[in-house]
Amino acid sequence: MKEPVWDEHADWWQREFTDGVDPEYVEQIIPLALEQVEGLDRVLDLGTGEGQLARAIVERQGGFVVGLDPTRSQIQVAQQRGGRVHYGLAGSDALPVADASFDAVVVCLVFEHVDALDASLTEVARVLRPGGRFVFFLNHPLLQTPDSGMIVDHMIEPPETYWRIGPYLPEAATVEEVQKDVRVRFVHRPLSRYVNGLIDAGLQLECMLEPAPPPGFIAKAGEYEHDVVRTTPRLLTLVARKPE
């Protein structure tokens, strides 16, 4: 799971996506995660980064919350930012955790950067107790494929705006310049790859959510103030359970 890019760009991630500055986290991801783990005492935030989701969970409901991430610079900042979270260094495909240790595992925008998907899902299933819940956030694998995005076609009158979908079925890794001089590696997989991976790991899919982009995101990205963007989900959430 460890990629040098996350050490290199840790400051960028912390500046742009944490500490309340990113509306998708504040208005959508964190509230959804809190809803899904409500009442569950032992929670693992896998790929915790600087820990904003883990902190939100422990602040809301207490309990025993662990944040694991393979990037040392992220974990160092997580520890500096405090909270009653237990942090550690680990990749998603080899967790230093005993079997059936957690009531819930949350993975947020992580596995689309991980090559070892099957091993990671197997580890998630291993550390969940029977009946435990897996909450899995990812960039929507159909609507956020490489080269997807809003297109304004000026070749017709009046101009037509639509959402272009890039190559969907091929499983491939790409490096995208997400901001000037910030290049991040993504692994695109079709949705069936994730669902079948859950099944192969022994997990049962219970719920799939495709929320519309939150108002704060639309307002922040002014060029996206169009119905085609408002009605095209950026996020996909899968909720699965380990059988009793």
Provide a role label for each language-model segment.
Residues D118-P130:
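A short glycine-rich, Lys/Arg-flanked "PGG" loop and its adjoining helix->strand segment in the class I
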Residues M1-G39, Q52-A56, Q74-V77, R81, R133-A173:
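Conserved class I S-adenosyl-L-methionine
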Residues L44-L46, E50-A94:
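Class I SAM-dependent methyltransferase SAM/SAH-binding core
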Residues A104-L117:
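A short SAM/SAH-binding and catalytic strip from SAM-dependent methyltransferases
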Residues A172, R185-M208:
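Short alpha-helix
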Residues G197-E244:
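C-terminal lobe and adjacent flexible extensions of AdoMet/dcAdoMet transferase-like proteins
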Residues D93-V105:
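A short acidic, Gly/Pro-enriched loop at the edge of an enzyme's catalytic core
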